[in-house]
């Protein structure tokens, strides 16, 4: 049955407009993005197929162009639209961090990190460079590694922070395995970076471990800084 044949109060668009986004299921929200279905399937049916195929919204949004386009009814145009939506979300969160003290919007920092690096299949190390008022100057991917290790050199982090005239930094890296617990190597790296940056009067405010399906783990909250 086409969505236009549904009772008006059950159609995703009408439901969103009258009851808000929280009233919609993942499939209904995705159907609004898809707009149309395909022969024999409504947009909601197609959305359910996509979620079943990828297993979650996170994996769907992290799919490659080839993986996404392999699904019947999808293609490069839809893939480009999805990536544009994701990038708009990242930029909106980055604006919040640019305009205010990051401690006034800690959820924005966490959400930005999850969107940026949470679903990557390889490990990356990011440095968020902050000014004296803890506003974001720039976020930089400094190193990229394998699934199990990445090479992070304190001198490169210090060099970057000085070049951008940063007063403080937030460190972040992802665990593609999905386990957010810090390893002994993670703790050692954090101490090394903090000590190196302290020598040039740059504060390390936090270090986050980011995964796809959980809130980033904060070293500061764990008492590991």
From Swiss-Prot:
MPN domain mapped to chain residues: 102-225
MF annotations from Gene Ontology: metal ion binding; metallopeptidase activity
Flavoprotein among keywords: no
One annotated GO biological process: proteolysis
Keywords: Hydrolase, Metal-binding, Metalloprotease, Protease, Zinc
Any matching Pfam family: UPF0758_N
Family: Belongs to the UPF0758 family.
Name by which UniProt lists this protein: UPF0758 protein AZOSEA04420
């Amino acid at each position: 049955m086409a969505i236009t044949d549904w009772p008006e109060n059950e159609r995703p668009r009408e439901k969103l407009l009258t009851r808000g986004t929280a009233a919609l299921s993942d499939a209904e929200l995705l159907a609004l993005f898809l707009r149309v279905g395909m022969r024999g399937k409504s947009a909601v049916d197609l959305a359910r197929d996509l979620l079943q195929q990828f297993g979650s919204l996170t994996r769907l949004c992290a799919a490659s162009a080839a993986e996404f386009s392999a699904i019947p009814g999808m293609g490069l145009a839809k893939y480009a639209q999805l990536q544009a939506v994701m990038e708009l979300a990242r930029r909106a969160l980055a604006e919040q961090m640019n305009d205010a003290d990051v401690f006034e919007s800690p959820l924005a920092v966490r959400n930005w990190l999850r969107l940026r690096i949470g679903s990557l299949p390889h490990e990356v190390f990011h440095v968020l460079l902050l000014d004296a008022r803890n506003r974001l100057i720039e976020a930089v991917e400094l190193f990229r590694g394998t699934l199990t290790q990445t090479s992070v050199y304190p001198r490169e982090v210090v060099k970057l922070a000085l070049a951008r005239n940063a007063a403080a930094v937030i460190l972040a890296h992802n665990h593609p395995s999905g386990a957010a617990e810090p390893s002994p190597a993670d703790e050692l790296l954090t101490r090394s970076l903090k000590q190196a940056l302290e020598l040039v009067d740059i504060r390390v405010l936090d270090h986050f471990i980011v995964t796809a399906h959980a809130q980033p783990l904060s070293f500061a909250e764990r008492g590991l800084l």
